[in-house]
Amino acid sequence: MTRESWRVPVRVDFAGGTLDLWPVYAMMGGCVTVNAAVDLWVEIGLSRSGAGHRITSRDLGLELKVEAWPPEPPPGLSWVWRVLDASGVPPADLTLHSPVPQGSGLGVSSCLGVGLLGAAMGLEAGEGLASKVPILRDLESRELQTPTGWQDYYPAALGGALALHWEGP
């Protein structure tokens, strides 16, 4: 069983953090969000083959072991399940670790989503992975049952410092 390792950076916002929400940027006639990837990494280890499925979150102290991929999100791992389910290729074994706690304001869940989708689909950081941002935004909106923006995902997908332009009509 071959084990793969993936890492994605979390991000910090400098300006325009909520301006990426529709219809805010449309009402303003366009705006800019400035953020950057930082040297704090969400780590994902996975194996694509094996019997059943196992998801382990070292930070949350959660482990899920199932024979078949569950049809509904499991408690405590619903975001992970939602992204992997959307990928169409959930791995046999998955281990997650983040040095940054959830709720820190550094976009951990969004960055985790980018890493999970990239790892499951075999997409490295770059334009290919960034093209999946609309899927992740919609999945997170469904997960949270609230509108979500775009900007949290791009530093994890592209790296570096970014000035993201949101155009109005």
How would you describe each model-predicted region?
Residues 2-11, 16-33, 57, 122-169:
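ATP-dependent small-molecule kinase catalytic core of the GHMP/sugar-kinase superfamily
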Residues 4-5, 39-139:
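Anion-binding (especially nucleotide phosphate/pyrophosphate-binding) glycine-rich loop
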